[in-house]
Amino acid sequence: FKCDWSSDVCSSDLGVLGGHWTRNLAADSKGTLYVAIGSNGNINDHDDPHRAAVSVVEPNGKLTQYATGLRNPVGITFYPGTDDLYVVVNERDGEGDELVPDYLTHVEKGAFYGWPYAYLGQHEEPSLKGKRPDLVAKAKVPDVLFRSHSAPLGLLFYTGTQFPAEYRGGAFVAHHGSWNAANPRGYKI
């Protein structure tokens, strides 16, 4: 990745402000820059290809989709020593206290993770039923589920030796906690 550092802007192609628009960055071993940008709403169709997605920032400043269907991908990082990309995602609200689980997942190039048409693989979003069966059919199941509305924000893979051996190679995920669950949850690592 090359950027004209005489400017403070490497890309202005981040879409319209609003919703879950403040984002995180990660760079792979080759210096390619990835940006996670959340949706512009809770459960809605959208026409901005860079929202609810992870994109690559091209040398010319334009964004190229890497993976889509990620409602609010917040924590983004590469597994240490690899170019394996992972994110933690805050899923949709309004489906009840126990749906839809937030998650951590390995992000694959070209993959679709469900939002807004499906969740947990091919479980169709009731309010958008029948709208995009093609996307529902290819929606990926996340790798690790967290309790709904726990709001995972930070993600760090642990390779140190300070903690017991069973933690090595695992992930620490910081949860912000719920704002809308009947019984608060989250607020933990």
Predicted segment positions?
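Beta-propeller domain segments
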Residues: T22, S39-N42, P49-A52, V57-P59, ...
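Single conserved hydrophobic/aromatic residue that forms the stacking wall/gate
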Residues: F1-C10
